[in-house]
């Protein structure tokens, strides 16, 4: 095991694992970046809701997962793109698409964390954090 930790990959793994176990919610250690990513997932309809929980430390994000009428998770794919050992960036002209625009890309830009659609609207690029479908 290497000494490098990747909080974003851990966050995404916790969401995937909770969905596989068909949990109604999952508690994840909070950070500004994870909160921003979770807000995007909420706005785009991939989760039901989330709340901040004070635990006398860094806090927790309680993410309420969303399933369809057949108990299939709303998030079908959650893939980490840029990693600590291999950062990936895209400028505003070359932002990737997921499933021909049906999914979203989450980016960290100079204007904050946003979806690919928002980044196109603002004409900014940034680090490609994740792809969601």
Curated annotation (Swiss-Prot):
rRNA-binding found in the keyword field: yes
Keywords: Ribonucleoprotein, Ribosomal protein, RNA-binding, rRNA-binding
GO cellular component: ribonucleoprotein complex; ribosome
Gene Ontology molecular functions: rRNA binding; structural constituent of ribosome
Residue ranges the record marks as coiled coil: none
GO BP, one annotated term: translation
Superkingdom to which the source organism belongs: Bacteria
Pfam families named among the record's database cross-references: Ribosomal_S8
Tagged with keyword Signal: no
Function recorded in the entry: One of the primary rRNA binding proteins, it binds directly to 16S rRNA central domain where it helps coordinate assembly of the platform of the 30S subunit.
Similarity section: Belongs to the universal ribosomal protein uS8 family.
Family annotation (PANTHER family): 40S RIBOSOMAL PROTEIN S15A
Official protein name in the record: Small ribosomal subunit protein uS8
Species of the source: Salinibacter ruber (strain DSM 13855 / M31)
């Amino acid at each position: 095991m290497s000494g490098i930790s990747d909080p974003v990959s851990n966050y995404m793994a916790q969401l995937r694992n909770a969905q596989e176990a068909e949990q109604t919610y999952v508690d994840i250690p909070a950070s500004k970046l994870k909160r921003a990513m979770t807000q995007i997932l909420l706005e785009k309809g991939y989760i039901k809701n989330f709340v901040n929980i004070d635990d006398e430390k860094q806090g927790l994000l309680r993410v309420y997962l969303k399933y369809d009428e057949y108990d299939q998770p709303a998030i079908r794919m959650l893939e980490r793109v840029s990693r600590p050992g291999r950062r990936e960036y895209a400028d505003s002209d070359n932002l990737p698409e997921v499933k021909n625009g049906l999914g979203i890309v989450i980016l960290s830009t100079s204007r904050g964390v946003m979806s690919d659609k928002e980044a196109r609207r603002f004409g900014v690029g940034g680090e490609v954090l994740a792809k969601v479908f």
